[in-house]
Amino acid sequence: MTRHDAQLYELKKKIEELKKIRGRGTELISLYIPAGYDLSKVMQQLREEYSTAQNIKSKTTRKNVLGALERAMQHLKLYKQTPENGLALFVGNVSEMEGNTDIRLWAIVPPEPLNVRLYRCDQTFVTEPLEEMLRVKDAYGLITVEKNEATIGLLRGKRIEVLDELTSNVPGKTRAGGQSARRYERIREQETHEFMKRIGEHANRVFLPLLEKGELKGIIVGGPGPTKEDFVEGDYLHHELKKKIIGVVDISYHGEYGLRELVEKASDILRDHEVIREKKLVNEFLKHVVKDTGLATYGEREVRRALEIGAVDTLLISEGYDKVRVRAKCNHCGWEELKTMSEEEFEVYKKKLTRCPKCGSQNLTIEKWDVAEELIKMAEEAGSDVEIISLDTEEGQQFYRAFGGLGAILRFKI
């Protein structure tokens, strides 16, 4: 899992949290600031909105909107300039008890540049611009190769994009005999070699930046004859890109139609590639658990300890894992409690804990954060790999049901 993948996973969790929140009136503020936008203009807009909000008829809604705007303006003062990818703020009263005020703020620096500027005060938060980032799927490189032409493309989700089309000067076959035929064949071979070099150079220029960003999940090469095998086996692609080739497919067409045929013919390869990789990881984890090799562990406490001592090779987290870490503290006597629970359990816990169990004070502070996000950050700091395990496979379901969706393959026994 690359840093970009981890950021998208964290973003998904935050969006899920934001979408659950409902305001009692139109009092939840969503603010999107694109990369490079002047923050002083945003502050000016918020001051104008603050002035307008003073005319809201409902006393409660007016109080909540003004409180949210004040909190947003205070937070923006922390920035000298807009973060590199822009900034999204979500602010509002999240208290479920009428008459109570609990103004919360979420500040999200997205993993990809924001290109929208938006201010909205509504009953729900506006998350669509961020959700759009989640809809961008892994990218697969596509190359179709023939003697005389080649096409380079990209598959993102269901969208096939033609990035480059090349043609060659490779001459056709000749009927000449003797030395002329051999000389002509050498010319054809040299022209073919030069053409393949050119294809490789263009592919390297397109795919290497995607590989560096962790977006390139594989490359599929297709063509009607043996030319595609010659291209794959030769030293035309960058060595790191050659490692990403996951399939070589026979196709009949070229150009955009060729890319579409390539994707259609390679549908099993594309589908099985991620599934096989995931199965392999889970099966390796299961093997260590069953054989009791000491090189696998599971459960939050055990995984957390393994991360703390740098023992984790690969952290496995199910996409269904939804635990949160909760810290409750009494501001009067100092009593403190730290627990891990589900979101549903947290809602019950929050309603029940109205007084300090030690001194009876109602002056309590309750903090909550996502366990998966915390463990991913710990893994990154420890140099461990992170893999999100889907619920789409039998192995993924087994990992979630039997181990709670959290485990680790270890570097050494602990």
UniProtKB/Swiss-Prot annotation:
One of its GO terms (molecular function) is translation release factor activity, codon specific. It comes from the Archaea. Directs the termination of nascent peptide synthesis (translation) in response to the termination codons UAA, UAG and UGA. Its main location: cytoplasm. Disulfide bonds: none annotated. This is Peptide chain release factor subunit 1. It comes from Pyrococcus abyssi (strain GE5 / Orsay). Pfam families: eRF1_1, eRF1_2, eRF1_3. Gene3D superfamilies: 3.30.1330.30, eRF1 domain 1, eRF1 domain 2. Keywords: Cytoplasm, Protein biosynthesis. InterPro entries: eFR1_2_sf, eRF1_1_Pelota, eRF1_1_sf, eRF1_2, eRF1_3, Peptide_chain-rel_aRF1, Peptide_chain-rel_eRF1/aRF1, Ribosomal_eL30-like_sf. It is found in: Cytoplasm. Heterodimer of two subunits, one of which binds GTP. SMART domains: eRF1_1. Belongs to the eukaryotic release factor 1 family. One of its GO terms (cellular component) is cytoplasm.
